[in-house]
Amino acid sequence: MRWMLMAIVATVVSTPAGGGDTGSIVVTIDGLRNAKGSARVALFNREPGFPDEEPAAYRTFVAEIVGAQVLVRFEQLPSGTYAVAMYHDENGDAKFNKGLFGIPKEGYGVSNNIVHAVRAPKFSEAVIPVSDGVKEIAIRVHY
């Protein structure tokens, strides 16, 4: 009996408050200049790879572009911090094309709409806290 009580206490102590909490992020992307290609959206839960290394993302989504806006929903996310990065893959090659000195050739955007002239946004600048419920964000595409 005593060991059962200890096991229950250990479980309660080791489980974070709201341990099963999950949330969602709804991303509205606007400012797309045309409906060519797709919008490639990546959700990151840590700095490495952010914003342009899609394989390093926690989750990814490829959205068909119909009209001037794209809506993407990431669901059942454990509570924590995330950042969203996207690019308009106009030529459909599934690559974020860049030119000389790494200057983007395709439209892009990140959460919190961070844009720098000389460097890519940092994860810490684009971070979004997520807990239970729905977090709605808007990303404006920059060309």
Protein language model features and the residues they cover:
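A short tyrosine-centered beta-strand micro-motif
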Residues: G80-M86
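Exposed aromatic-hydrophobic patches
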Residues: L71-Q76
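Surface-exposed loops/turns
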Residues: V66, P78-S79
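Acidic, glycine-anchored loop motifs typical of Ca2+
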Residues: E90-K98
